[in-house]
Amino acid sequence: MYYKEDLGYVYPERSDEHMIEVKHLRDTHFDEHFNYLDKSTWFKIKRFFLRIALYLVGFPVCTIRHGLRIYGRDKLKKNKELLKDGAITICNHVFMWDYLCVMKAIRPRLQYHPGWKTNFEGPNAPFIRIVGGIPVPTGNIRAMVKFKKAIDEVLETKQWLHFFPEGSMWFYYPDIRPLKPAVFNFAARHNKPVIPITISFRKRTGLWKLLGKKPLADLHIGDPLFPDTTLSIKEATDKLHKEAYHIMQVMNGINPGDPTYNTDQNIDNYKKTM
């Protein structure tokens, strides 16, 4: 169901522009020497304890804080055989730590996910790394090559990968912003299914009003989308890109003909809806 509430946020003009400031705590050189994909034994041990902490603390907290309801987990079970060689999940990015909601939705799987490099220099950096964060480098071609190799390795080893393809987080924004095409290029090159996930909102009512003022969250899992292997990589990327954007909007109750339904994924042309 489509629901929006004016919470007084001032959204940036560009749809991929960030609206938060991260306290800078450390200088990290995200260059060609950085270890983008941690495969150490110590990292695996931390991931083991992460799984326990998520079930005992993380998932209950995000459920209570956001009134989280999850729809569509049956689709993961129904397509289990098709997803056994890995998948890419995508979701709109609408509040801090909405990734925990995604992790709860696809449990018991743990993923990797590319993220804004500034977050990896802030107070949450250690936790972001443990939950699978891979910083996206900028301004360095050799660093970007190594980053892409890390992403390729995740997919080649049949693991799951998550993207927030809008490129930034906008607090409680109800519409789906344009999606960056790189996500779908990875899917097309590796022939991996893309699982669309969206977060929509509902009004706080009853006892939920005692726990906060912001809208509650509904998470929707869609059917997996598969690259068209009869097309070239570019054509398959474009097709998947278009299909995913349409489906994510429909999943959030935004249908063709509605005032905020959008087909133009050019970020420079996007007009914010509130």
Placement of each model-derived feature along the sequence:
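A generic secondary-structure micro-motif detector
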Residues: R47, P114, N140-I141, Y172-P174
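Conserved beta-strand scaffold positions in the cores of enzyme catalytic domains, especially
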Residues: I70, H113, G133-P135, V194-P196, ...
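Structural motif corresponding to alpha-helix initiation and N-cap regions
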Residues: I70-R73, E121, V145-K148
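Residue-level "edge-of-site" marker
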Residues: D74, I141, S200
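Structured helix-beta-strand junction loops
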Residues: I64, R109, I130-V131, T157-K158, ...
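Catalytic core of membrane glycerolipid acyltransferases/transacylases, capturing the structured
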Residues: E81-I141
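Membrane-anchoring hydrophobic helices of lipid-metabolizing enzymes
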Residues: M1-I88, W97-C101, D268-M274
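Non-catalytic C-terminal accessory region of glycerolipid acyltransferases
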Residues: M1-F30, V145-M274
